Amino acid sequence: MTPIPYAEIGVTTNFSFLHGGSHPQAYVHQAAEYGLTAIGIADHNTLAGIVRAYSELSNDQLGYRPKLLYGARLVFTCGTPDILVYPRDRAAYGRLCQLLTRGKRGSDLDKVAKGDCRLAFEDLFDFIAGQLLVLMPPHRFDEDALGAILARLKDSPAEGVWLAGSLLYRGDDRRRLARLARLAASAKVPLIATNDVLYHHPQQRMLQDVLTCIREKASIESIGRRLQANAERHLKPGHEMARLFRDHPEAIAETLRFTDRIVFSLDQLKYQYPDEPVPPGKTAQGHLEDLTWAGAKTYFGDKLDDRLRAVLNKELALIAELNYAHYFLTVHDIVRYARSEGILCQGRGSAANSAVCYVLGITSVDPTKIDLLFERFISKERLEPPDIDVDFEHSRREEVMQYVYHRYGRHRAAIIATVIHYRPRSAIRDVGKALGLTEDVTSVLADTVWGSWGDGLSDMQVRQAGLDPHNPMIRRAVELASELITFPRHLSQHVGGYVLTQDRLDSYVPIGNAAMDDRTFIEWDKDDVDALSMMKVDVLALGMLTCIRKSFDLIADHKGRRYVLSDIKSEDDNEVYQMLQRGESLGVFQVESRAQMNMLPRLKPRTFYDLVIEVAIVRPGPIQGDMVHPYLRRRNKLEKVTYPSPSPDHGPSDELYKVLHKTLGVPLFQEQAMRIAIEAAKFSPEEANGLRRAMATFRNVGTIGSYEEKMVSNMIARGYDPAFAKSCFDQIKGFGSYGFPESHAASFAQLVYVSSWLKYFHPDAFCCALLNSQPMGFYAPAQIVGDARKNGVEIRDIDVSHSFADNTLEKTDGEYCAVRLGFRQIDGFRWIDRDEERIRKLSEAVRKEALSVSTRSLPAISPVSFRGARSANPESRDSGFALRAPRNDNDRQIPLHNDDREDDWADRIIRARQRRPFTSLEDFARDTALPKRALLLLADADAFRSLGLDRRAALWAVRRLPDDVPLPLFEAAIAREQPDEGAQPLPEMPLPEHVVADYQTIRLSLKGHPMEFLRRRFAAEGVLACRDVNDTNDRRRIRCAGVVLVRQRPGSAKGVVFMTLEDETGIANIVVWPKVMETFRKEVMGARLVLVEGRIQSSPEKVVHLVAERLVDRTADLTLLSDDRLDAIPHGATPAEPLNDDRRDHTDNPSQRVSHPRNVRILPRSRDFH
């Protein structure tokens, strides 16, 4: 049947968050199937979904491509009925973006919250020129009120005004349409047909109902008439709409006239990168070339040979041809600013393939040491903008981000969005609430989900939760939750990707406020930006750079040597590689995970390139392609190095030699996978580019699978071994989950070596800096401290007479300084982080500067002083920036604001002891004027030892103090009134209680490990210590117990869970196979202390695992860690345990009692990764 021409202009997608029940892509396919002339995407106050629909039009599976209209459904705060707005042309589209930006930004005096859009009807008229407006009448409407709105719109410069007619399917549709037709005629506007679509197919109706319940915070049972009355609000074919509007055929025909009026398409967004200021008489390209050759001279001097010169010339020529000089100057400027402020930074990703980026100081991969593939970074065949990722110190990255805003103005710079999708946990929770399941049921179902990703809940997981998977309500909840997964929940800001434009960015895309102060972000994510060929600059954060900078500062302040990143050469120290070969990498960047620690003794890195391979090899790509074991066998001379080749009549036998020779004939990197597709499967440049983009789409593995048949069949047809062809593509699919290109691995390997060098030569500074950079990495403070002590570093307790806010170094007579724990280690203790304070002061200056400027016009914000951005010395720490970081911990004694002293308890202590030493707790309390809560926290952390008080004595002494520090006039009177309880000696606190109290207050203990006090109990059960596990013969069955440090369930491990247990002797590595995991899911996921029974698995390199067969949750044993419960020794009349400040006595109410006498958590939770 020939389709009846019809255009649906009223489509709501799931980017009208919790309003629409289908993806934009689904609408495009459904419209193509129905043969619709056009569809109009009009989400609620947003353009967030339009690029998804636009990109889907290029899908090869579409036989017919309907015209796509890009608009928004304006939902007003003043009660005006919704209006669909479609821009006629590019200029009108820009005005629509600016209108939505107004609603999302507000003003400095009336800031709009993230995710909100506040628009009044009057706002529309400032941007109405060139817009096609469709008034959407509510279910019940007043004809006079609608007539007045239509008249007002008709008198405006709008391109056209229409009244929408839609059916409610409630029995009075013909009468209602007749009223609307009369109203349209009297207002002299056309009536236009729409089904006011909420989902693409009727089968989505149930999910739509659930979304409505979630939005309205109601259950299916209670929501009543707020649900749609039927399943008719789906996309309908033209003949069906013509039948429904048979009394008003002109309304159908009007949809085509409406569509013809619109000439705008996203193809018309001609992106222009902002110009960069250059010296007088210079072009951007000329200035870039001057900087490049100056940098080459700085880095290489007389060693700048002809080969490297040719590489630089080739890159500069391509940059000139593609007109990318401004982009490189932007990134160079940002990096130079950061370095002028003493902020460590380093580029990574495909940009590390560029020699120009290296000599500009953007990346750290020396082009003379690594064979670079510049074409992976920039290629004229791809015609895609370059993408330079730069990592900055995590604690100071915000300074760089604010510099970008002020450098370009908020009207030309904004962060891209990240779409936050429903994942299994959130989906089952929200669906369960909507269906009326109890909180207990939804929680137990959600708790069976490991990590954030997955397709839904299996029957096994439902049974694990103690529920019946065949129960109709449970089954429906699980099915709907599976459908909801991948639906967008809301927009958030990207971790650091900026879009910059020459003209107004808000003429391309709406800009809204982020949750963080002084951040704004656009509505499109990185995939949307890439689809429109817009350049972005990634200003990313890396915790290890913060740790390295703090290590350098500590070394300079305490050892007299100032290091910068370039001082540490990766070929200098064999001892560092020997340390890594032993798997001693706790705290080291990228190689501290369980899998990496196990790989290090097998790989035995000896050179920098070995570190590049180490970083890349423990990734889903090589693992899923089964490339790891062949590489290790060849590296260890257990297997001959061969290179796959085609049959003689299809090509030379060495066609893959250049691709694979550095990795012994085994593909490990993304670049190699792409080259194999070109060389062995003979992909065209377009196909190879599509494959590259698919590999770069993190976790979007579905896009890679479409290339599988062609690549594998092509390779087999050319004579390649089928197993090799299949494994190559399995590797590529792994890259779709997560994989590293060689250039990226090389950038990270630089930091692997630097952090390893610090760990080996300066373990004191490295430990201190790691603690001061938390939270980061795999391991908690207790393990960081334990590792440092094992390596000869003395760790000293927190003490009010010696500690600062941060952990610090103190001189000793030994080889290393001692690490003095700081007040920041005490949970709940108030102290001010100077990096954060610097950013706060900067933000206040920015807001003050812009306060008088209305953001409704969004002009460029006047730059706040960022002196130092043009510093000639990139390593200089002494800039003119008023908010420079403190050089050492003594600087922390001076707060940036006097009124901050009230909130900075650490600062009060330091200032008081500068005036005179503390002699007693009462003296300390008077001099510091700390609140009683602060004194209790210090006492609970055992921080009064220098005053002769242990934890228990200090707690009792604090409890004797008045609640408020008295004025001196009343001190004597109060002292006379205080009973002299100190005269009665308190019994010593048992050591097990001290250890537990340490873990509860500072997350570590220097006095012992909880397991050593349980050792006798476990030894009686035949349980081995962790140290003995590592010395046990292969395949022997044993039992082991320990505190759970880390749980990992990598996506590449096919459901295998890895656990790391710790006791007083060391750690043990546990492997839990999927079947065991399903049987003991509760123990694996929830236990703090676990007993494992299983068999030893030992490799020739003595990498030992315990393969679990049975697990027992022994967390309850931790409650025994008070001496009376372990050994039943009486303590007399005084309390046996210290008193916590939230402790309440409820001796008469058993329901208030808890399992442990301290009424707080026994041990911190493990760190779980997936």
Swiss-Prot record:
GO molecular function, one term: DNA-directed DNA polymerase activity
Protein name stated in the entry: Error-prone DNA polymerase
Native species: Bradyrhizobium sp. (strain ORS 278)
Entries under Gene3D superfamilies matching the protein: Metal-dependent hydrolases, Nucleic acid-binding proteins
PANTHER family for this protein: DNA POLYMERASE III SUBUNIT ALPHA, ERROR-PRONE DNA POLYMERASE
Phylogenetic lineage: Bacteria, Pseudomonadati, Pseudomonadota, Alphaproteobacteria, Hyphomicrobiales
GO CC annotations, alphabetized: cytoplasm
Main location: cytoplasm
EC number in record: 2.7.7.7
Domain of life: Bacteria
SUPFAM superfamilies for the chain: PHP domain-like
Biased composition (Basic and acidic residues): 886-899
Region of interest (Disordered), residue spans: 867-899, 1129-1170
Secreted in keyword set: no
Similarity remark: Belongs to the DNA polymerase type-C family. DnaE2 subfamily.
Cellular localization per UniProt: Cytoplasm
Keyword entries, A-Z: Cytoplasm, DNA damage, DNA repair, DNA replication, DNA-directed DNA polymerase, Nucleotidyltransferase, Transferase
Function, as annotated: DNA polymerase involved in damage-induced mutagenesis and translesion synthesis (TLS). It is not the major replicative DNA polymerase.
Pfam families assigned: DNA_pol3_alpha, DNA_pol3_finger, HHH_6, PHP, tRNA_anti-codon
Catalytic activity: DNA(n) + a 2'-deoxyribonucleoside 5'-triphosphate = DNA(n+1) + diphosphate
GO BP field: DNA repair; DNA replication
Entries under SMART domains matching the protein: POLIIIAc
